């Protein structure tokens, strides 16, 4: 078992002090957690600094914390913010490592088998390994995750028990170490030294842990004893220092020892025999032949290599679980007394609920037609009630908590006051008759003042028609639809802020996570059409997009007042009254947020430009110039990785290797 380091407290680093009603929110949340409250809601209005409040709570309760977001983009933003707040602690990132993923499936109507096809992002895989190893080695850990955290991951006990612990002076032969590394799925490659690999040079073994991307370790032997362990730069071999202890975790999360492997294979064979009998009794000879061929091949691979493609489908046997028992997930790597924070909980909890059913429907088809054993159904995401069983203490964070969260707890901590003094916007309702001309007049007013406008519609056709109409009227406008990729979306938001265009039209893209202080008008068309996009929560989230500007204003175009509209307007007015009273009492004049227009796109392009320049000129460089270029590229590679632009980081890494090969 791995001995954790001495307890280290979380240390929050920030130039800001809590303000507005952050202090009371922080104090109440902390008191409730320390008092044993299982669940509570942080109801924080848009722009009130919920992430900062979360960070303050984590630093005061000093518990390992899992922060769950509903998509990779939001998880990436939170990861960056927590890294800034906690530079001395372990802040980790755990999302799906697939850049592309086509799950294994079978379509009976056309007799089409779709083989699993995927592209794994090496950088995210490294970050996942970093998260699990940190959780087993230390206490001061924050993991920011997507709903990937409820998917099967392999047994934390097997993962920890398989780890190889090394110290100077330890009696172990070089060959014993090599065998131990192979057992935990490290691959020997004396030429191409990458994560999850090792190389051997005489009495020196160099190992590249799966959780690192720059630093490797050099283990020097004297006979059958470790003489010294040194940390080195993986690219240059430069020695960074000596280590008095090294723990090497497996290169894959699905790992088991030889004894357990044989037991697992016996169980797989027994299940195969039972399923073959069932198919033959039902006259499904094709399915029986298919299942026998596939499973026996996988068994042979497991025996010889300890691994096979799709090994996760046998995880129930390898983990020693019973049928129907939940899989091990990231949650099992945390200690019992850990804290969960669910960001944008009204979205995230819905995702957690929905993952299981979709996964089961697809896998059941594979089982019925002989592509997989029934135990493959137990390689699955957790059900919501199974997720709940892992909860020791939880904080739901949202401006608009969902029904589920409200059912879980009566403890609601409000954070309504913005540190900037900004108020929730005024909301007015206007008739839909003549709305185009009315809206055009409002847009022109904002353009004259150098401000921006958001317009949200209900249908794609209406968004397209409105875009065409406004263009004809001379308005600089863009329509952001669901086919636009994340990076393009970031670029569109940046262009809106820069004034490349003045109006952005969308359907469901104008709610969570879009921060544009220049927007002073939000127009909601068809506000009286009740439904997912026009319910109370959807309307409050959309109204919140105008809450970062001192002149924020919202116009709902509708022919009648629905209950959802009334509740959204009343809640906004309630918050606005609280904020105005606070400002008056403290002599605060609301100021529009001044936020630098600096984002992933612009920085990535600057880095990419430097990379392209270096690539164009490096052949004519002197050796010393090349060394300087390498240093700059390594810095750029780090910047790209920190921005989660892993594709660019990989390109820069390859360019660095080319430059080094020239010397």
Swiss-Prot record:
Family affiliation: Belongs to the UvrB family.
HAMAP family: UvrB (MF_00204)
UniProt organism field: Streptococcus equi subsp. equi (strain 4047)
Free-text comment on this protein's domains from its UniProt entry: The beta-hairpin motif is involved in DNA binding.
Any one GO biological process: SOS response
Cellular compartments per GO CC: cytoplasm; excinuclease repair complex
Motif (Beta-hairpin): 97-120
Superkingdom as given in the UniProt entry: Bacteria
Official protein name in the record: UvrABC system protein B
Gene encoding the protein: uvrB
GO molecular function per UniProt: ATP binding; ATP hydrolysis activity; DNA binding; excinuclease ABC activity; helicase activity
Domain (Helicase C-terminal): residue spans on this chain: 435-601
Purpose: The UvrABC repair system catalyzes the recognition and processing of DNA lesions. A damage recognition complex composed of 2 UvrA and 2 UvrB subunits scans DNA for abnormalities. Upon binding of the UvrA(2)B(2) complex to a putative damaged site, the DNA wraps around one UvrB monomer. DNA wrap is dependent on ATP binding by UvrB and probably causes local melting of the DNA helix, facilitating insertion of UvrB beta-hairpin between the DNA strands. Then UvrB probes one DNA strand for the presence of a lesion.
UVR domain span: 627-662
Localization annotation: Cytoplasm
Domain Helicase ATP-binding: 31-271
